[in-house]
Amino acid sequence: MHKKYFIGTSILIAVFVVIFDQVTKYIIATTMKIGDSFEVIPHFLNITSHRNNGAAWGILSGKMTFFFIITIIILIALVYFFIKDAQYNLFMQVAISLLFAGALGNFIDRILTGEVVDFIDTNIFGYDFPIFNIADSSLTIGVILIIIALLKDTSNKKDKEVK
């Protein structure tokens, strides 16, 4: 018999990501001034203290009420999808846990300070990517995993239709 929900694994992932996110942001916020930067991997990775009161790339800057409302809706929707659509599917449950943790990590920043602490500053193939944080990484990985799960599910359905 397969487990319907992997609650322990899902909670562990979400708690770990949120704690790691908040601890790294706290270290950056308390040890670096905004704009301070140091090189970790030459021409690829810097740690740069930055604040963002919008979404990715500063979109919707200063719209905190919007972010509060939309984040609460997203967190509730993620719990709903976890319960309704991720049954017996550890892969999907991990993906949803990463999305939940990422959304919660940035939500905590917005509640406490009205802005998100960003610090991971990368230069990928000559493109100076916008500065981001652990929560953003968790969101991105969660989205990628959900896309993979959906593509895999679509592929499995096509295989079953052929048989």
Curated annotation (Swiss-Prot):
Q: Which GO terms describe its molecular function?
A: aspartic-type endopeptidase activity
Where does the chain cross the membrane?
A: 11-31, 63-83, 88-108, 131-151
Give the reaction(s) catalysed.
Release of signal peptides from bacterial membrane prolipoproteins. Hydrolyzes -Xaa-Yaa-Zaa-|-(S,diacylglyceryl)Cys-, in which Xaa is hydrophobic (preferably Leu), and Yaa (Ala or Ser) and Zaa (Gly or Ala) have small, neutral side chains
Highest taxon in the source lineage: Bacteria
Q: In which pathway does it act?
A: Protein modification; lipoprotein biosynthesis (signal peptide cleavage)
The record's annotation in Pfam families points to: Peptidase_A8
User: Where mainly found?
Assistant: membrane
Keyword Cell membrane assigned: yes
Specify the protein's topology with respect to the membrane.
Answer: Multi-pass membrane protein
Keyword terms of this UniProt record: Aspartyl protease, Cell membrane, Hydrolase, Membrane, Protease, Transmembrane, Transmembrane helix
One GO BP annotation is: proteolysis
What is the E.C. number?
3.4.23.36
For whether the record's keyword set contains Transmembrane helix, the answer is yes
Please give the PROSITE patterns that the UniProt record associates with this protein: SPASE_II
Under NCBIfam families, the record lists: lspA
Record-stated family = Belongs to the peptidase A8 family.
What role is this protein assigned? This protein specifically catalyzes the removal of signal peptides from prolipoproteins.
Protein name, as recorded: Lipoprotein signal peptidase
Q: Which organism is it from?
A: Staphylococcus aureus
